[in-house]
Amino acid sequence: VNYVILATPPGFRPVHLAYAMAKGKNVFMEKPVAVDGPGIRSVLASYQVAEDKGLCVAAGTQRRHQKPYIETVARLQEGAIGDVMYIKAYWNGGAIWHRGDKGATPMEVQMRNWYHYTWICGDHIVEQHVHNLDVGNWIMGAHPVRAYGQGGRQGLGPDVSGEKWDHFAVEYEYPNGVHMFSQCRQMAHCEGRVAEAVVGSKGYSNCQDWIRFNEGRPFRYRGEK
């Protein structure tokens, strides 16, 4: 075995990664890499083991591997739209699956419906919206230092077991004072939007494949996808 793919529910990711590092295996692991503080600290320790052993560890933050994003973000980092004023991030989609509770022990219920339990999933922001938030961090070359948010559980009725919320809105602040405005939702019969956008002093971009300037011709990515 040369490498392993870690794609189980993310609550198990840190212990699986630590075992793979102990066995000297290269790893591709899906996002998120962990769902809580202890898990993150374990992953950071495993990263150091990978460095010491010369192993490769790749994570499934997919936009960093998509050529249109790579080209567009590189231009944004070079100052194509001037100073970044604010960023927007969205993952608004339909309702998430639930496999029911009948005929199962409490632990079986949580395993079958892992997306609905925070200890194993991390909830929507951590498990899925991380893709969009990662684009903001990528552009800024930094992580937020503050967050102000709210959310709730509206579409998931009392007959749906679990702890997850189905909608969130969070405002993140980066060290230089730039804000990222975030929305994510998993509710049926609502408008969907999965996207990012950045507004600067000289233009704006969808972060993915185009940049529009206050003056001059826009940029459009036309290379390989």
List where the protein language model places each region.
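Phosphate/diphosphate-binding loops
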Residues: 180, 186-188
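Beta-strand-loop-alpha-helix segment that lines the small-molecule cofactor/substrate pocket
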Residues: 14-65, 79
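Glycine-centered tight beta-turn/hairpin loop motif at sheet-sheet or coil-to-beta transitions
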Residues: 175-179, 202-203
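N-terminal Rossmann-like NAD(P) cofactor-binding module of classical short-chain dehydrogenase/reductase
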Residues: 2-5
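N-terminal glycine-rich "phosphate-gripper" loop used for MgATP/nucleotide binding
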Residues: 8-11
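Acidic surface patches and DE-rich sequence motifs
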Residues: 174, 200, 213
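Predominantly a Rossmann-like dinucleotide-binding segment in NAD(P)-dependent oxidoreductases
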Residues: 52-59, 63-162, 172, 188-190, ...
